[in-house]
Amino acid sequence: MASRGKTETSKLKQNLEEQLDRLMQQLQDLEECREELDADEYEETKKETLEQLSEFNDSLKKIMSGNMTLVDELSGMQLAIQAAISQAFKTPEVIRLFAKKQPGQLRTRLAEMDRDLMVGKLERELYTQRKVEILTALRKLGEKLTEDDETFLSANASAVLSQFEKVSTELGSGDKVLALAGFDVEKAKK
């Protein structure tokens, strides 16, 4: 019976990750197609996606209140949802890698961006925004940053990103993170 519970927990976790991936991909696709949509279509689609994130967040809250064995594994997903809703991170890809706790892929993405900047495929402003997001995500995942990365982060971190990092560190417990994410969803709907 214990092994069946582990299997079910694993399957539930997989399903939740797939749902989060789908929502993050939806946000990413929306940003990529922003120019092709009129303002109303864009805002409506974004609002619907945020509502879906809110519903997903509510589901996570119910799961966490009933099954404490999932708390640690779901905390990363909650922080990712919080970041998406509060728009601390603007890049859905970074949110997805953060939620899946994949620092190696975040570092690979950072190296690709460095290359793209050097060959002129990426504008400096976008590079700076994304690098700050990735470095913040790496720090939140407990990764050691180089002195240069720390300096870059200090010089370029936005107030929103700094607030996300501060709040996510201070809150710690799942209920408080969920409460904040729920508040951010309500604020985004208005």
From Swiss-Prot:
It comes from the Eukaryota. Gene3D superfamilies: Beta-catenin-interacting ICAT. GO terms for molecular function: beta-catenin binding. One of its GO terms (biological process) is response to ionizing radiation. Residues 2-63 form a coiled coil. The keyword Coiled coil applies. Keywords: Coiled coil. InterPro entries: ICAT_dom (IPR009428), ICAT_sf (IPR036911). Belongs to the CTNNBIP1 family. Does not interact with CTNNB1. This is Protein LZIC.
